[in-house]
Amino acid sequence: MSEIKLGIIGGGQLGSMLSEAARKLNIKTIIYCDDPNAPAKNFCDDFIYAEYNNKEKIYEFAKKVDVITYEFENIPFDTLSELNKLKPVSPKPSVNRLIQHRLAEKDFINKLNIRTTRYVLIKSKEELLPLEDFLPGILK
């Protein structure tokens, strides 16, 4: 059986932990990150530093891996979609698009009958004032 190469987009703490866990399973990891000093650089087998919209580097990354995942939600949707044409990306880019928008994410979860905290969309300061019953609360 040939060695598995896992591509991880993002090089933070989760990328570091994923690389460490993969190593225990004899899975090679290649990190793609826009931070040249990312913590995961110290734990992976290969590291590609580039902006997330650098098509040349994205293709270089895809050639080196068998499957791709990402460690945080702020990867551009277009980048993940392009990668998904080249190699399997998990979670799918459509999931990434959903989790980038907190209101859409909450609405989706509630449609699955999974309870979340109460929430409301506020578009202006005037809409905030009558919402005293939501306090204390978090404004995002």
Question: Language model features by range: what are they?
Answer:
Residues M1-Q100, A104:
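ATP-binding N-terminal substructure of ATP-dependent carboxylate-amine bond-forming enzymes
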